[in-house]
Regions:
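Sec-dependent N-terminal signal peptides
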Residues: 5-13
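N-terminal signal peptide c-region/cleavage motif recognized by signal peptidases
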Residues: 14-18
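Electrostatic cytochrome c docking/interface patches
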Residues: 22-52
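Soluble non-cytosolic domains of exported or imported proteins
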Residues: 34-38, 52, 91-95, 111-116
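The canonical Cys-X-X-Cys-His
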Residues: 53-65, 121
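Short cysteine/histidine-rich zinc-coordinating motifs and their immediately flanking basic loops
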Residues: 70-77
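Short microdomains enriched in Cys/His and/or Lys/Arg
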Residues: 79-95
Length: 128
């Protein structure tokens, strides 16, 4: 009797796809669960363009055209575009999004971002 491995492969593939199914709205829902929202494009844009800790702003490294690559000011490492329209996978992994918010908020703002600020920034970035 021959057994097919195809059903098992299909099941594993479907399960793996479920892990990657999140999008920017799912990430924002995580912040809503923390009591944040509603999120605002205008507040996100204002936060993006404001100067914070030691005169830094998001555009210092990410640039002003968020459909293009940026460059980290200190390390000179390239940064992929932030606009969701050209970088469709950037905001699909909550753990990855949180890691970068933690690093970048502390470096740019001198503190962690609030869930409201994160949601507003994502609202801005997802519409570009």
């Amino acid at each position: 009797m021959k057994t097919s491995v195809l059903p098992g492969v299909l099941l594993l593939s479907a399960a793996s796809a479920g892990l990657q199914a999140a999008d920017v709205n799912d990430v924002q829902n995580h912040y809503r669960d923390s009591g944040a929202g509603p999120f605002s494009f205008d507040r996100g844009e204002m936060l993006w363009n404001s100067q914070f800790y030691e005169g830094r702003q998001c555009a210092t490294c990410h640039g002003t055209d968020l459909t293009r690559n940026g460059r980290h000011e200190r390390t000179q490492k390239p940064i992929e575009p932030m606009a969701a329209s050209v970088n469709t996978t950037r905001y699909k992994d909550l753990k990855e999004v949180e890691k970068w918010f933690m690093r970048n908020c502390k470096w740019t703002w001198g503190r962690e971002c609030t869930p409201q600020e994160k949601g507003d920034l994502l609202e801005y970035l997802k519409r570009l």
